[in-house]
Amino acid sequence: MEPISYLQAIILGALQGLSEPFPISSLGHAVLLPKLLGWNIHQNADYFLSFLVATHCATALVLFIYFFEDWKRIWFGFLRSIKGRATPADTDSRLAWIIIIGTIPAGILGLALEHKLRTLFASPTAAAAFLTVNGFLLLAVERFRRRPPIPGDGEGDGDERIAKMGFRQALGIGAAQALALIPGISRSGVTMGGGLLAGLSNEDAARYGFLLATPVIGAAGVLKLPELLGSTGDGVRGQALVGAIAAAITTWAAVKFLLRYFETNRLSPFGIYCVCAGVFCLVVFSV
């Protein structure tokens, strides 16, 4: 019997693609859904983690392609900065360092804590509890966010506003991403919440979250890709490919929707959803 069926792979892949950009915890949903549907999938099993590697790589690739023109500008801005050609007004150069500073602590803490956190909190009950916590955090961020937002000079200057964040704020947001290793806590929710508290608008915070997530998710996926290609990936490579395709499609749709959604809307509905879904799962699992 296959450890993951192709139908399950499509559903889990599509769910990963949707829930990674949304501030609702992709890892939490990957733990909760199989339990709710009665699937015989062990979340701590090597084959399941290998499957998730494929879907995360697909998500990171789509994020890179979606923001490819932005990444080109950021890359050339970074090159100007190390060659000493960047000016204080060079938005792309400063944005590059904002992303680098936010990525480093996330990577270090992720490598140090990933196995321990996932082992401690990978149970469906723990994931439901932390999903509820995630919801309350989103609601609290909207309540206590900094107002007015960081000013800009007009339309289309979101990168300029993001680049005006302090390096200390970027470092703190990057370190806080380690919380997303706990199933139920959302990486995009943490980064967007940090951006809002730093004074960004919802739209700019979402954009910053997507840019910051790309190297973090991509690096984590590449580091674990040998597991999928090695013996631990035996029996799930076909399902992983199907799941990755599903994740790629839904990631693109989710990012496109959210960038438009956050032009005029807030995090609150996602906070309410997380609280309701988390409490519902806790009740179901306790019966």
Model-identified regions with their sequence ranges:
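Multi-pass membrane proteins that catalyze or facilitate reactions on polyprenyl-/lipid-phosphate substrates
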Residues: 1-287
